[in-house]
From Swiss-Prot:
Name this protein carries in UniProt: Sulfite reductase [NADPH] hemoprotein beta-component
Keywords in alphabetical order: 4Fe-4S, Amino-acid biosynthesis, Cysteine biosynthesis, Heme, Iron, Iron-sulfur, Metal-binding, NADP, Oxidoreductase
Annotated GO biological process: cysteine biosynthetic process; hydrogen sulfide biosynthetic process; sulfate assimilation
Source organism per UniProt: Yersinia pseudotuberculosis serotype IB (strain PB1/+)
UniProt function note: Component of the sulfite reductase complex that catalyzes the 6-electron reduction of sulfite to sulfide. This is one of several activities required for the biosynthesis of L-cysteine from sulfate.
Lineage summary: Bacteria, Pseudomonadati, Pseudomonadota, Gammaproteobacteria, Enterobacterales
Length: 576
């Protein structure tokens, strides 16, 4: 596709089966309540398998033992992954202690997984523990509503502990946007919290009776940090401040990274700039973008249903004009903004409020007690004495925020005692990330979380060998092309193709504003490391001052930049 072809506003044709499922679900109830009482299987069946996603859960099984159980004529060991709704990633120490205990007592793996969407997941909840899990969240003032499926997911907000006043304002907007776009159905409260069924008819004034065509992701971003990776998201509010006070947002729409191997009608896409709005129009614009996508998104093909494809089909200006019409608001010209990076500042920083903030590097976001490194216990011990809050970051790390000077030494001592602070962690490790993948993700094609630590060790060796031990490459591994690991915004991105094999993408940048192009297809880790060694060798010798690896491979002609991904993402580049 070399030209822009505006298409119809609404795609006609046979609706996908997901649309049938939603329309017949009675506003997301299905027969989940009845299925809960079916002790003959450890899983949810039929439509309920997908409907539980609207309630924040995915049905999974342990793929390490799937074949063994099949030989024994047993069904897979079904267990649920439950994802909390936590706009902006802020959680109190008291809430943390509650989830820490639940993970230990009621999950197969005993871990808490911080995700790159600023929340946490429990993995391995057996069917009998699912309802208690939701009830626990409710007791803690939390929920899992709308953290999966065709709704607005967990709203991200830049974790900026230094500009505390600005962060607080941005965080409040993340919460407001999340609440405004939530499903209104009482199904969640009825099924999980035993809320009384009332005779009123459910209505979904924003999402509609069949909800959105596909998942929808929203961020609130405070430049110059792009830690939330705005270009992976459908709707982005980029903070504009005046004298340290939030005055409005630049709005960017239509980002997204998921693709399908072998289907060139799918592609990653950066978000498009729509314009600037003052704060008072934020919720109206959020609602208008969502309802436009609700009505115009492709409901016949789920692989082409996301906002990014709607924008390409109808045209950015047409979509933008419809948003303005529905919101009764005109966008002003974009205000200047710039991103300089997206990594977390590991260690202590002092905020303008004179409080201290400690960012702990949590490799892969997995909190568990390992031999010699009791990470999960360490965070719980800090929670017992911490007077501020915890902030989960989009880089899967944890910030102990709002520490007064008098508590600083004690919290650092606990962090060091439990292996949560390690002065030997390299910049490379801190800038590497993977999705969960095997053994729990049903979509996994290749290892990611379990693969990353040793792979990073080998990359560290390459950097050291070329005299770049203090440097880093933004490295991401995602176990399948759905892209949860956000590899398609990395300088070096690995996308799982098959067990032990990945597509290697090069040429993103450190700021997360360029999509990397595929350099080699379906290759092994050893082959990737060989290529990395050769290219890092050139980078060490030929780089400009402060030139990142991704910028270097573009400038050196190793790979051509992706300029317009809907048209050039799959262009074959001859390797140099």
């Amino acid at each position: 596709m070399n030209e822009k072809h505006p298409g119809p506003l609404v795609v006609s044709g046979k609706l996908s089966d997901g649309e049938r499922m939603k329309s017949e679900s009675n506003f997301l109830r299905g027969t989940i309540a009845e299925d809960l009482n079916n002790g003959l299987t450890g899983g949810f069946s039929g439509d309920n398998f997908l409907l539980i996603r609207f309630h924040g859960m995915y049905q999974q099984d342990d793929r390490d033992i799937r074949a063994e159980r099949a030989e024994q004529k047993l069904e897979p060991r079904h267990a649920m992954m439950l994802r909390c709704r936590l706009p902006g990633g802020i959680i109190t120490p008291q809430q943390w202690l509650g989830i820490d205990k639940f993970a230990a007592d009621n999950t197969l793996y005993g871990s808490i997984r911080i995700t790159n969407r600023q929340t946490f997941q429990f993995h391995g909840i057996l069917k009998g523990n699912v309802k208690p899990a939701h009830q626990l969240l409710n007791e803690l003032g939390l929920d899992a509503l709308a953290t999966a499926n065709d709704v607005n997911r967990n709203v991200l907000c830049t974790s900026n502990p230094v500009e505390s006043a600005l962060h607080q304002e941005a965080y409040e907007w993340a919460k407001k946007i999340s609440e405004h776009l939530l499903p209104r159905t009482r199904a969640y409260a009825e099924i999980w919290l035993d809320a009384e069924k009332v005779a009123t008819t459910d209505e979904e004034p924003i999402l509609g009776a069949t909800y959105l065509p596909r998942k929808f992701k929203t961020t609130v971003v405070i430049p110059p940090q792009n830690d939330v990776d705005l270009h992976a998201n459908d709707l982005n509010f980029v903070a504009v401040a005046d004298k340290g006070k939030l005055i409005g947002f630049n709005v960017l729409v239509g980002g997204g990274l998921s693709i399908a191997h072998g289907d060139k009608n799918t592609y990653p896409r950066k978000a498009s700039e729509f314009g600037y709005i003052p704060l008072k129009h934020t919720l109206a614009i959020a609602e208008a973008v969502v309802t436009t996508q609700r009505d115009w998104g492709n409901r016949t093909d789920r692989k082409n249903a996301k906002t990014k494809y709607t924008l390409e089909r109808v045209g950015v200006e047409t979509f933008k004009a419809e948003v303005e019409k529905r919101a009764g608001v005109s966008f002003s010209a974009i205000k200047p903004y710039q991103f300089t990076g997206r990594g977390d500042r590991i260690g202590w920083v002092k905020g303008v409020d004179k409080k201290w903030h400690l960012t702990l590097f949590i490799e892969n976001g997995r909190l568990l007690d390992y031999p010699g490194r009791s990470l999960k216990t360490g965070v719980a011990e800090i929670a017992k004495i911490h007077q501020g809050d915890f902030r989960l970051t989009a880089n899967q790390n944890l910030i102990v925020a709002g520490v007064p000077e008098k508590d600083k030494a004690r919290i650092e001592a606990l962090a060091r005692e439990h292996g949560l602070m390690d002065d030997h962690v390299t910049s490379q490790r801190e800038n590497s990330m993977a999705c969960v993948s095997f053994p729990t993700c049903p979509l996994a094609m290749a290892e990611a979380e379990r693969f990353l630590p040793e792979f990073v060790t080998r990359v560290e060796g390459i950097l050291q060998q070329h005299g770049l031990a203090d440097e880093h490459i933004v490295l991401r591994v995602t176990g399948c092309p759905n892209g949860c690991g956000r590899a398609l915004l990395a300088e070096v991105g690995l996308v799982g193709k098959a067990v032990g094999r990945y597509n290697l993408h090069l040429g993103g940048n450190r700021e997360g504003t360029r999509i990397p192009r595929m350099y080699r297809e379906n290759i092994t880790a050893d082959e990737i490391l060989l290529i990395t060694d050769q290219l890092v060798g050139r980078w060490a010798k030929e780089r400009h001052v402060d030139e990142g690896f991704g910028d270097f491979v573009i400038r050196a002609g190793v790979i051509a930049p992706v300029i317009d991904s809907a048209r050039d993402f799959y262009d074959v580049q001859e390797a140099m």
